[in-house]
Every structure is written in structure tokens, then in C-alpha cells.
Amino acid sequence: MTRRSPLLRIAGLLLILSGLLLNHRALGAALATDEEVTRPLALVAILLMQAVLALAGLWLLLRPPRGPVPAFVGAPLLLALAGVTGFGAWAEARYREWVQPRIRQLPELCECWSKRPESFPGAAKLTWATANLKRAEATSKDSVDTVEWKTMLGDFLLRDGQNDKATQILQQALESAKARSMPVHRINQIRRWLGVANMRVGEVQHCIRMHGAESCLFPISKNAVWQNKTGAFKAMEYFRQFLQDEPGDPSVRWMLNVANMIAGTYPEGVPPSDLIPPSVYASSEPTPRFREIASSLGIAPVQLAGGAIVDDFDNDGFLDIVVSTFDPCTPLSYFHNDGNGSFSDWTAKAGLEEQTGGFNIGQTDFNNDGLLDIYVKRGAWLRTSGRMRDSLLRQNPDGTFTDVTDESGLGAYAYPDISAEWADYDNDGDLDLYVGGEMLTDTKWSPSQLFRNNGDGTFTEVARQAGVLNMRNVKGIAWGDYDNDGDQDLYVSNLGQPNRLYRNNGDRTFTDVGPELGVAEIPPFNRTFATWFFDANNDGWLDIYVGGYAYLGGTGLPDISLVAADYLGMPTNAETLHVFLNDGTGHFHDASERMNLNHVRAPMGANYGDIDNDGYPDIYLATGGPAFDLLVPNILYRNIGGEYFSDVTTAANVGHLQKGHGVAFGDIDNDGDQDIYVQMGGIYRSDVTASALFENPGTSNHWLTVKLVGVKSNRPGVGARIKLIVNEHGKPREIHAVGGSGGSFGSNSFQQEIGVGAAECIEEIEVWWPASGIRQKFQNLPVDKFIQVTEGAPDYRILERKAIKLRGEGPSGREPRPQAALFGAPGGTRPPGPRPPGAQGG
């Protein structure tokens, strides 16, 4: 009887195994540049290949025996099949993240984008549209396809900073569309883009190159109108023509009104049917009027989007500023507060010149040495190209920083991230780190990571064991003890998927209770961004803020259409801002409508502070969408007695029209009120903007600034709870604060700057340190003081802090501090890349 060859059996098994392993997900992870196979033809081919391999394997296993296979045939066959199977196993392991892909080091992305400019966000589409336009023109100069490609190319040229060329090609598209008698709606879309292009030309000249303190603040004042109004008048004409054919379009109405503002013809120059009256955006509450002084202080880097920290890095009693930018060739900027009303650039002195890029940054003290360290978050929005490592920068006693990412164990992983936050989740006295993973492909997400601090300068990644992998597209992270049980819970804001509320079980594990507590779903599309825990109504229970992010998709409308429609009272199908109030039993209810936050504003960066020292947290939102037509103001909401929020943007003079990202509150001049620093800039390589510092003029309300010093707990007191009892107008009230840096996109000072309203004495302050369980109470404290509370100490200490007058020039302003030039940046420029010898960084 002829026996079946064992070689054929093994070959059959290997073929079947190869058929299973070589699926489209594994092959995409192994071979595709974006780690995903999406073309239908390729998907069909892979499925057919899998079927052939599996059927061939079954045939070899089941075919009748026909004698032995010669070794010189069987051995090479088995080796080949083993190689194919091994490749399939490796590809599958890579897809499932069992094999970590190569991590990009800091200089790599800069070098890549310098040599291959098409790698920059939006640049590849410019090349693609140019090639398609050439193909369309080869057939006909005025075909419908040619018009479509010219319109699309105009948009991509704007993103690239080629504004004049964009205007020229859009004008050609308009003439061709008219000649072909294309539908009015299609002609109007070209007019709309021509209006945007003409406004962009003026925006670059007046808001960036000739930047002044009020040149970009909404509503544009008569003192800030453009000197060269040509672009504004051209834009008005296109917008008026659009509205004659399609009256009522919210985005075009909005842009027509803004164009009139910047030309100095608002409101009289706007047709009555299209006028957006000042009452639409006017403030109804009295509010201190800020002045923007960043440029005159030399702390306004002209950059792409990035993060910001306001804190005292050298422990001299004055708050410094650290800024990052998405540009992979520009280093962090460290502006030292000199204590005399001016700032010095300490970037080089602190050894930060090699720390380039960073969509977001935050401060920490991971080793409890009393020196603030910096964590840099990288790779956001870049999907698989964003597998570059973050950086943990340890501050040394001499004020320099050392990159300890690898030696700490944080450098072993790299996923794109925009949000990472610190807290002592296991109450062992040191700060742990949660890093939110982003989308890698259309169907694949990065795991989020929880790094437990080992107390010796190293970390262990424990997300899977703790139950917080998330596997969604994270855009915001917040730690806070929502149930007042003494341990830190975790809220995760996911873009396009339900959010998570991970309850800390007290045993180093978490349970997602978001759905049952009603804080997971944000209708209609679960698109949210920045988030935080705060006590919005001072009842001693932490509430949740999470900002809806209305972007292109879902409704099919661009950002400005949604935001403008909301301003005009028109219905929108988009996410609004949300606040979930804690009812004191650990449950939440959506109070967004009652508190007047149910509006579409599309913020990325956001944070909270107390601008009027009334003891209730206010909110500043930085509108950060990528589109050039998103000329909507950043927003300041004042908290009115914990009952509702009032939009006081125009009264406060803080409605910057350029794209905002990192937002940081802090008392920069030590005068007792919180100033606001906003990192400005977009994501497309020409969309650079000067950052802003809004100086608070103050009110008559009183305040207390508390510096926490942990002993058994983490040194900066992150997560510690502060309760003040004051008597205001003859009535006792409580004011609550929590140690930390505020929201998830921008970092406030760790010192707690607490307003106490009209109270002239603080009857009692209580500080609760959850890690140790220590509760300290002190009575009869003076107001308008800086104090230090050290964990376990018998008394507090008054700190001597000198108030200073910032040397800003107010409305006049001056030129922004020069920065390393960016791709297509205005003002004559160098693309990102290695700097010439002797060149100074950011």
C-alpha cells in the first residue's frame, strides 16, 4: 500500500496556514506605506490568493497517495513554504502590535519632510491634484473635469501658501464654469473659494507679516482695519454674488461680514439681508478688557499648531512660558520671566534646541525633586507616519534638561498622540502617565498606554492589566476623582467614537462606567476633543467638560458653516460643547443646555481658569480646525455663579480669529489675576501665526494663590483637593480647587490661583492629600497673598512675590519674534530641515 508522503502533509499544512496569515490586514501592516490595503482590486486579489493557498493545502492533505516525493523537490518546496508562512506570521504579529514597528527618531521626520516636501500634511494632495489637472487639460482646457480639478487645486495651493497662484487658477475655473453654463451652485462654490483666497492674501499681510495687538481680534475694530483693502473688497464682491444666487448661506454671510470688518465698512457696507448685527456676538456680562502683548514682549513665535505651558520652571517666583510646534524642524521655545516685566529666550541655555516638534506639551515632576520636567507629545494626526517617540525631559539642578525617554522606559513604544496626562493613580506618591493612542489607519487604532512610575526614574507599561487600552482615537485625557473615594479616575475623549469614563477600582485596575453614567455618547457623531474635570458649581464634586468638535464629515459641511449657523440661531447637526454636572452621588447629568454651552464652536485647544476672581472657573476655547475659511473667533466663557456660562469674548477683547491650540492660564505678572497665553497656528505648512498673551487688567475681587508641596504625595500636589470657606456679603460659601494643570490641550501653572470674590478674609482652607490621607486645615488667612502648603506641616507659609508691570505695548504692538521659517511661510522662507551652521533655532 502506497503511503502519503509526510512532506506533502507538511506542505499542505503550511499552505493552509499561509492562506490564513496572508490576509489584507497583515499584508497592509507589512507592505503598505500607510499600513492599510484599501483598493478594491487589491482586496479581491488578496482574497483569491488566500482561497488558492487554502484549497491547495487541502488538496495536498486529502489527495490519494502516489508514492514518495523526491527529497531534491520536497526540501526546497518546504523551505519556500516555511518562508512564506514565516512572513505571514511576522506580518500578522506586526498588525496585532506583537512586533513593534521601528520608532522614528527626532531628526528623521524633519529630514524626511525637507527632502520630500510632499510628505507634509496636505502637500501630497497638491501633487495629486496638479497631476490630475494636467491629464484633464490634455483632453480639454474647459471641460467639467478641468474646472473641478482647478477648483480643488486652488484649495490645495492655499494650504501650500501659494496664495496668488491659487487666486489665479480659481479665477480661470470661474471663467470656464461660466462659459460652460455650469449649475449656479457649482459656480458659487468657486466664488466662495475666490473670496477665501482673496481674504487669505490680506490675512497673511496684516495678521502675520504686519501683526499688531488688535489686527486679528474679533470684531475687528476701526483701529485694526487693513491698510491694503484690495483683497477684502474683492472677497466681498464674490460673497455678494454668491448670496444673490443662494441667499442665506451661513458661512458666506459670516465671511461677508468679516470682510467688511477688516475693510472698515461694517456694518453699513453689508446688505441688510446679509448683516450679522453686533447683538449676535455682543457680550451681555461686564468683563475685564484684556490687552494682547505677546509680540511686544518677544514671546510670540510665528509657528504652526502646538502646545503651551505656563509655570515657574526655575523656582524664582515668576511664571515662565514654554511653547511647542507641530513643525518637526523647530525646537521648543522657553521664555524665561525675568521678573522685571520682560522675558528672555532660554531655549539654548536650557539645552532644548534639539527637542523639535511636538503638537502638545505638559509639565510634570516625575522624580519628585522639586524641579519641573517636560513631556512632549508627538505624531498627532499623522497616522502611521506618526510613530515617533515622545520625549520626557528631566530638569537638572542647573536649569538644563536631559532627554531621559529611553532610560526611563518610555521610549520603547511609539504611537501618534496629542494627549498625555499625569496623575498618581495608585497613590504611591509619584506621578504616573497615561498616553492616548490615535488612529493609525481607517480601520486600526493605537492602544493607549498607562505607564506606572516605579519610583526609581523608570516606568512600567500596564494598560492591558489595568483595563485602559481604549483602542480608540484619543484627543483628550483628564484625571480626576469624580466619586470622592480618594483615587484618580480617568476620562478619555475619543474623536468619532464613544468616550470612556474609567472608574478607579482602587486595586490598580479600572472599569469603564461611561455608558451607565451617561457621559460616553456625544451626539450626533461622538466627535469630541479637549476635556477636563473641574468643579463648575463649587459643590465639592468634580464635573466633566468635553468639547464637541464639528469638522468636515457627517453633515458634509465645512467647519465654518456649522459654527456660523449656530451663531445665527440656525439648526445644526453637529456636536456642541458639553458639561456633565456631578449630582453628588457619583452620577452625572447633561447640563450643557441649562448652562448655555450647547453651542457649536469646534475648539481644539481649551482650558479653564478664573479671569474675574469670583471663585467660579471660566473657559477659554481655541478654535483650531485646519480649513482656511474657518475665520471664527476663539471664545471666552465667563462662569456666572455656577449657574450658566456667558460668552464674554468681545467684552474681554480675546476673540483671536487665527487658529488657536495650546491654552494656558497663569498669573504671569504676580498681580493676583490670571493672564491667558494661547499658542497659535494651523497644520498646513503656510498656516503660521504669532502666539498671543492676553494680559488681565484685574477686578476688585480678592484672591489667594496656593503652592502645594507634597511630601508623601507627589511633589507638585497633582490631585490634591483644596476647599476654601469664605464669607461673602454676609453669606458663607465654599470654593473648591484641585491640584493640576487644567485641561488636556494647554497646561496651566501648578500653583492654584483661586479667586475668592468680595471676601476680605478666608475663614478656613482645607487641603486633602489623597495619597497619604492627610487633611490639613488652617483658619483666618489673609486674602491677596501667595502661600505655600507643605503636606503634613503644622502651618502654611506666606511667600513673598513681587508684582511686576509687563512691558507690553498694548494695541500698537510690534513685529513678532522671528522664528525658524516654515514651508511656504510668509516673509521669505526656508523649508523645515537641518539648520545651517550657526543658525539659531526657534
Name what the model sees in each region:
Residues 67-89:
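Internal/C-terminal transmembrane anchor helices
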Residues 83-185, 189, 200-222, 226:
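N-terminal alpha-helical interaction modules that lie
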Residues 172-188, 196-241, 265-286, 560-563, ...:
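Short coil/linker segments at helix-helix boundaries
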Residues 268-303, 335-356, 391-415, 447, ...:
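Blade-edge motifs of beta-propeller repeat domains
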Residues 305-315, 336, 358-371, 417-427, ...:
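Beta-propeller blade termini
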Residues 308, 316, 320-325, 370, ...:
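Hydrophobic beta-strand segments that make up the repeating blades of beta-propeller
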Residues 644-646, 650-659, 664, 668-835, ...:
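Gly/Ser/Thr/Pro-enriched helix-cap/hinge segments flanking short amphipathic alpha-helices
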